[in-house]
């Protein structure tokens, strides 16, 4: 069944998907609309760090927006990101809106510091959301045991909680 990208849950995110909002830097990062432009990556894990590092090949600057005050990524990945001259971490911050739906393209993000409440706008041409995945297991709820995140619980030999279902 696979998994789907976790979304920010913003109306502007949905409206601007494929118009500057994307979930895959390696798929879309080299597109002309992103070249030599400021870009935003949302997230703080290994995937977000990989996306940010990849995008430094194309973007003028990459803002790494993370809701915490340090990365959750592995130490080696975090060190690479924090040393890179084209990556600017934006700590303790969440995206509250992606701009600009009226122009039908991404022109920036409105962000809010979760500690101070201060808001500001970061100008950018693209938003790369890298905040994890959600398993596509909705159809199995109530039929097969799922963990707290919605993943199928496996027993020995890849068996599930239902005999004969692997």
Task: For each feature predicted by the language model, list its residue ranges.
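Glycine-rich Rossmann-fold phosphate-binding loop(s) that bind the pyrophosphate
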Residues: 43-45
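N-terminal Rossmann-fold NAD(P) dinucleotide-binding loop
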Residues: 48-49
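FAD-site-proximal beta/loop scaffold in flavoenzymes
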Residues: 4, 9, 14-33, 131-166
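A Rossmann-like FAD-binding core segment of flavoenzymes
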Residues: 56-156
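Hydrophobic/aromatic beta-strand patches that form the interior of the parallel beta-sheet core
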Residues: 22, 40, 63-65, 90, ...
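Short coil/turn connectors at secondary-structure junctions
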Residues: 18, 35-38, 58-60, 85, ...
């Amino acid at each position: 069944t696979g998994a789907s990208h976790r979304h920010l849950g913003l109306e502007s995110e949905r409206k601007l998907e494929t118009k500057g909002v994307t979930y895959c830097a390696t798929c879309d990062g080299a597109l002309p609309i992103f070249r030599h432009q400021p870009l935003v990556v949302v997230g703080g894990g290994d995937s977000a760090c990989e996306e940010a590092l990849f995008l430094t090949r194309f973007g003028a600057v990459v803002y790494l927006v993370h809701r915490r005050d340090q990365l959750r990524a592995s130490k080696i990945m975090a060190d690479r990101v924090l040393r890179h001259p084209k990556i600017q971490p934006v700590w303790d911050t969440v995206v509250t809106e992606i701009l600009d739906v009226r122009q039908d393209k991404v022109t920036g993000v409105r962000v809010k510091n979760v500690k101070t409440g201060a808001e500001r706008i970061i100008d950018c041409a693209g938003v790369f959301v890298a905040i994890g995945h959600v398993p596509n297991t909705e159809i199995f709820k109530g039929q097969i045991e799922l963990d707290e995140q919605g993943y199928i619980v496996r027993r020995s030999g890849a068996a599930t909680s239902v005999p004969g279902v692997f």
